[in-house]
Each structure stands twice: as C-alpha cells, then as structure tokens.
Amino acid sequence: MEGKWLLCLLLVLGTAAVEAHDGHDDDAIDIEDDLDDVIEEVEDSKSKSDASTPPSPKVTYKAPVPTGEVYFADSFDRGSLSGWILSKAKKDDTDDEIAKYDGKWEVDEMKETKLPGDKGLVLMSRAKHHAISAKLNKPFLFDTKPLIVQYEVNFQNGIECGGAYVKLLSKTAELSLDQFHDKTPYTIMFGPDKCGEDYKLHFIFRHKNPKTGVYEEKHAKRPDADLKTYFTDKKTHLYTLILNPDNSFEILVDQSVVNSGNLLNDMTPPVNPSREIEDPEDRKPEDWDERPKIADPDAVKPDDWDEDAPSKIPDEEATKPEGWLDDEPEYIPDPDAEKPEDWDEDMDGEWEAPQIANPKCESAPGCGVWQRPMIDNPNYKGKWKPPMIDNPNYQGIWKPRKIPNPDFFEDLEPFKMTPFSAIGLELWSMTSDIFFDNFIISGDRRVVDDWANDGWGLKKAADGAAEPGVVLQMLEAAEERPWLWVVYILTVALPVFLVILFCCSGKKQSNAMEYKKTDAPQPDVKDEEGKEEEKNKRDEEEEEEKLEEKQKSDAEEDGVTGSQDEEDSKPKAEEDEILNRSPRNRKPRRE
C-alpha cells in the first residue's frame, strides 16, 4: 500500500516539474497543494502501518561536565554571562561612531532549538564591533602536554561577512580584559571566517623571534576541504584544534580532520628564515650578457629584397561592374529633414541636413568613383632582419650572490609558544544571531572527546531525530533548487515508469508463429482470438465424447481372453491417435 502512495507521489513530482518549467504561478500553487495532500496521505498510511512500532526516543538535554582536568570549560547553561567580561575599549584609527565595542552579547537558546534547555553565547548585533573574554582556570604553558581547543558555532541566519574565531590571549602583565581590542596580544587565533565567497578556517599563531624579540604571525595552509557548507547549512558545527609537542597539528570540523601539518613546514611565512640570502649590495656587471639569442652578424640582405614594396596593391585584373553609377554619390542629404526651430546658427553653426543612403544606389552595383580592389602584393617582403642565432657570449640570467643571513635563527620547537591566560572573541559581523557553545581547553584528548559527545553529540542526535523523511528532504531541496525536479524525473520517476511498463505489458505470440513449430496440418488462423478459443473448447468436448463411446463399445464387443493385453493396447493406440488430432495440441502456447 505504501509503495502505491510513493508511486503516486513520484507521478505528482513529475507533474510539478513540468508545470514549474512552464512558469505558471497559479498552477504551481495547485501543485504544491496536491503535493501536501499526497504527503499527508503517505504519512497517514505510514502511521497506520507502523502503529505497532514505538516512536523514536526523544533526546533530553543534560549539561556536559568535564571528565578530567581542563584549563577552561563553559556550556552557558547557567543562563548568564558570569565569568565573561565585556570590552569597554575603542579601536584605534577608526571613526568614533564605529570605534566602540558596543555589539551586544546574550546567553540564550537557539531560535530553532531541538534541545530545550541548551543555551549558548549569542552575538546579537550586526554591523558592530564585538569583544568579550574570560579568564582561564590557570594559564596554559606549552611544555609536554598537547593543546586542544574546541567549541561550537551555529550561523543561525547564515553569514554574509564576519568571523566566529577565538583568540587565546597571551599572558602579559598588561592584559586587561575590559580593554580587550584588536591589537591585544594573542598567542593563537583559530576558527571560521567568511566574507563574500571567501570561506576560511583560520589557524594563526604569533611566533617570537629569539634574536630580536619581535612577534610575527604564522598562518597555516588553507584546508583542502570545501568549507562552504559549514557556513550555509545553519547547523551547529564543532571546531577543534590540536597542537602536539612534536610540532604537528590537526584541525577538525565535526570530529573529522580537514587540515593537518607541521609547524616547521606548513606555515606561511616559515618559522625559521633561510640560512642564506641574496647580497643586497651585489650589482650586475655592465658587460654581463643575458641574451640567449642574437642577430647573426654575418648575415647580409639579399640584393633582390625590396623593403619599400607595399603589402597591398590594386587588382589589375578587376573590371568595373556594369551599371555602376559614377555620377551618383553613395550618401545624399535627407530631403525630408528640416532645420529645428531652436537652431541658432551663431551658436550651432550652419545647419546641414543629415546624410542618408542614396536610394538610386540600392538597385545598382555601386555609386561614386569606382576604384580597383586591393589585393596582397606577391612581391612584398617587408623590412629585412638578420636571422637569430645562439649567443656565444650568453652568461645566463644574473642573480646576486648568496651570503649568510645575518638574521638567521633556528627554532626547532615552535610548539613552545607564549603562554596564554584568557580566551576572547573579538569580532565584526554583518550578520546577527551567531551562536557559540561548549568552549573547552584541555591537554587531554579523552576529556575533550567526552565533552564533545555530551554536548555537540546531543545536538547531532536531536537533529537526526527531527530530520524529515527522504521524501520531505527531496521536496525541501527542490524548493531551494527548482532544477532538481528535472533530476527527480530522470533518475526516479522515469525509470520506475519504464520498469512498470515493461513488466505489465505482455505480448502474445500469434498462432501463425506458434504453428511454425510443427509440421502437423493446422486450420486457418482466425482473426479474432475469442472465436478461436471457443472453437477449440467445443472440438475438445466432442472428441472426449467420441472417445468415451468408443471405449464403451469396445468393452461390450470384446470379452476377457488370454490376449487381454493385446486388446487393451489397441484402444490405447486409437486414443493416442485421437489425442494427436485433438485441438488441444493446436492451442497456442502462452508465455
């Protein structure tokens, strides 16, 4: 029963695709109503057939609790910004109107939450600067433990231009969280960022030059994965950064690795400078020859080379077409044109009628003075140049010599970064309602994974429980991308229709074809199938009656004798002969 409804739904989908292609709005509305009715009927039939099946278990939210040592963890389920400090700073070199960090933050549930009671930190404003930060339980020191940073982001309204990255603020004596701004020193910046069609997942760390003490930003290579979906699907995604003491790093989204590498080899610019550099004082010698080819100095221009010959010459074989109007101009003043009333000859000059095509030239091959057409000059050679040969004095492309880099250093442990003591969000966004949740910083991978399972894992399970059926997902996708209707028809409805057509449309073999399989004489084939079957049935009954009478008479005439077997075999042979002539054997075989 359910299969029939699905088939009906596929047929309706095909109808909707055709109507959508025609572009009639009223018809499209009717089709949507039909689709809703069919979907409701399918759901009713499913509910009846699955009445004995227990409903899917409802996911109940419970705030995650760290299962081990953490430097920071916050699920925001207490419902307040306790522990977080809003910035009161102003951005430098910015107009006063937009220099303030006056963007609003709130702790609230997601607008379309599947987990009642699950709250998070929400960036509420658009086109404003936002800054908020919180102290760690204790500073993180880069020694023998890995660093694992993890948090969740949901772009509830999508994202036009803005970021959702975190900054791990360096431990300094000057650090004041209420003055947190864009130039506050940080150790690591990590998280998603997007503007236009540029989708990024930042991992930046500030490396201290051991010789000069100057900090320089080092950027990880761009991930190979396509990041667009994480910004557009309006789902909660889990971002994880793992830094190991052996300088390796991993970046994960939803617990799947999207980028990995080594701090020594996969950062731009590199952590360690080159041992040698080009000598800035070196200069190319004046006689240095970088020309790989030169003109042949021994080549001589041929005596018959005419450099003055034109590239085009008149075609001497051309003749003027008959009927050419030499005395008629190609264009004439428009006789119907009149000088505008506001024409001022002192200001505008003498008025002249606009030129139009001479109507007399329309029926003639041409007008005006006839000139021979130009053709390529077969004797044209152009300016003579000597051929090019290899330069015997070629010395290659000059490069300055290499000298030892006076600023060279070698840091083989870039993992040992500046300790940090706070986490902060310093963001500008053109989109509001960005949802953050379940921040955790730890040195234990197991603790972070448990936190993810108890937080993000519940969101994922709740989303799966509330996920619509396959049919509804197809309909929702087609609403966003109308061209999918055509795909549905070609990949689903059309093959199903062809299979049904193939299976249900049997084709009878004609009697004439069946008769080709035997040499026995056969009656003429009737045009009507019904008459043939009726005649066969009647002949069969007559033959059976004759056979019964024959057997009865034979039994009365012949007594029981010692040659009983011989007598019994005779009626049997006659019976076989009659059966061979019976119309039963002439009935066509059914497929």
From Swiss-Prot:
<keyword id="KW-0732">Signal</keyword>
<dbReference type="GO" id="GO:0031965">
    <property type="term" value="C:nuclear membrane"/>
</dbReference>
<dbReference type="GO" id="GO:0051082">
    <property type="term" value="F:unfolded protein binding"/>
</dbReference>
<feature type="topological domain" description="Lumenal">
    <location>
        <begin position="21"/>
        <end position="482"/>
    </location>
</feature>
<keyword id="KW-1015">Disulfide bond</keyword>
<feature type="repeat" description="1-4">
    <location>
        <begin position="334"/>
        <end position="346"/>
    </location>
</feature>
<feature type="disulfide bond">
    <location>
        <begin position="361"/>
        <end position="367"/>
    </location>
</feature>
<feature type="repeat" description="1-2">
    <location>
        <begin position="296"/>
        <end position="308"/>
    </location>
</feature>
<feature type="region of interest" description="Disordered">
    <location>
        <begin position="514"/>
        <end position="591"/>
    </location>
</feature>
<feature type="region of interest" description="Interaction with PPIB">
    <location>
        <begin position="327"/>
        <end position="360"/>
    </location>
</feature>
<dbReference type="InterPro" id="IPR001580">
    <property type="entry name" value="Calret/calnex"/>
</dbReference>
<keyword id="KW-0256">Endoplasmic reticulum</keyword>
<feature type="modified residue" description="Phosphoserine">
    <location>
        <position position="553"/>
    </location>
</feature>
<dbReference type="GO" id="GO:0016020">
    <property type="term" value="C:membrane"/>
</dbReference>
<keyword id="KW-0007">Acetylation</keyword>
<feature type="transmembrane region" description="Helical">
    <location>
        <begin position="483"/>
        <end position="503"/>
    </location>
</feature>
<feature type="binding site">
    <location>
        <position position="75"/>
    </location>
    <ligand>
        <name>Ca(2+)</name>
    </ligand>
</feature>
<keyword id="KW-0106">Calcium</keyword>
<feature type="topological domain" description="Cytoplasmic">
    <location>
        <begin position="504"/>
        <end position="591"/>
    </location>
</feature>
<keyword id="KW-0564">Palmitate</keyword>
<feature type="lipid moiety-binding region" description="S-palmitoyl cysteine">
    <location>
        <position position="503"/>
    </location>
</feature>
<comment type="similarity">
    <text>Belongs to the calreticulin family.</text>
</comment>
<dbReference type="GO" id="GO:0044233">
    <property type="term" value="C:mitochondria-associated endoplasmic reticulum membrane contact site"/>
</dbReference>
<keyword id="KW-0832">Ubl conjugation</keyword>
<keyword id="KW-0496">Mitochondrion</keyword>
<feature type="disulfide bond">
    <location>
        <begin position="161"/>
        <end position="195"/>
    </location>
</feature>
<feature type="repeat" description="2-1">
    <location>
        <begin position="349"/>
        <end position="359"/>
    </location>
</feature>
<feature type="binding site">
    <location>
        <position position="165"/>
    </location>
    <ligand>
        <name>an alpha-D-glucoside</name>
    </ligand>
</feature>
<dbReference type="InterPro" id="IPR013320">
    <property type="entry name" value="ConA-like_dom_sf"/>
</dbReference>
<dbReference type="GO" id="GO:0031966">
    <property type="term" value="C:mitochondrial membrane"/>
</dbReference>
<dbReference type="GO" id="GO:0006457">
    <property type="term" value="P:protein folding"/>
</dbReference>
<dbReference type="GO" id="GO:0030246">
    <property type="term" value="F:carbohydrate binding"/>
</dbReference>
<feature type="binding site">
    <location>
        <position position="186"/>
    </location>
    <ligand>
        <name>an alpha-D-glucoside</name>
    </ligand>
</feature>
<keyword id="KW-0472">Membrane</keyword>
<feature type="compositionally biased region" description="Acidic residues">
    <location>
        <begin position="555"/>
        <end position="568"/>
    </location>
</feature>
<feature type="repeat" description="2-4">
    <location>
        <begin position="396"/>
        <end position="406"/>
    </location>
</feature>
<keyword id="KW-0430">Lectin</keyword>
<comment type="function">
    <text>Calcium-binding protein that interacts with newly synthesized monoglucosylated glycoproteins in the endoplasmic reticulum. It may act in assisting protein assembly and/or in the retention within the ER of unassembled protein subunits. It seems to play a major role in the quality control apparatus of the ER by the retention of incorrectly folded proteins. Associated with partial T-cell antigen receptor complexes that escape the ER of immature thymocytes, it may function as a signaling complex regulating thymocyte maturation.</text>
</comment>
<comment type="subunit">
    <text>Interacts with MAPK3/ERK1. Interacts with KCNH2. Associates with ribosomes. The palmitoylated form interacts with the ribosome-translocon complex component SSR1, promoting efficient folding of glycoproteins. Interacts with SERPINA2P/SERPINA2 and with the S and Z variants of SERPINA1. Interacts with SGIP1; involved in negative regulation of endocytosis. Interacts with PPIB. Interacts with SMIM22. Interacts with TMX2. Interacts with TMEM35A/NACHO. Interacts with CHRNA7. Interacts with reticulophagy regulators RETREG2 and RETREG3.</text>
</comment>
<dbReference type="GO" id="GO:0033162">
    <property type="term" value="C:melanosome membrane"/>
</dbReference>
<feature type="signal peptide">
    <location>
        <begin position="1"/>
        <end position="20"/>
    </location>
</feature>
<feature type="binding site">
    <location>
        <position position="118"/>
    </location>
    <ligand>
        <name>Ca(2+)</name>
    </ligand>
</feature>
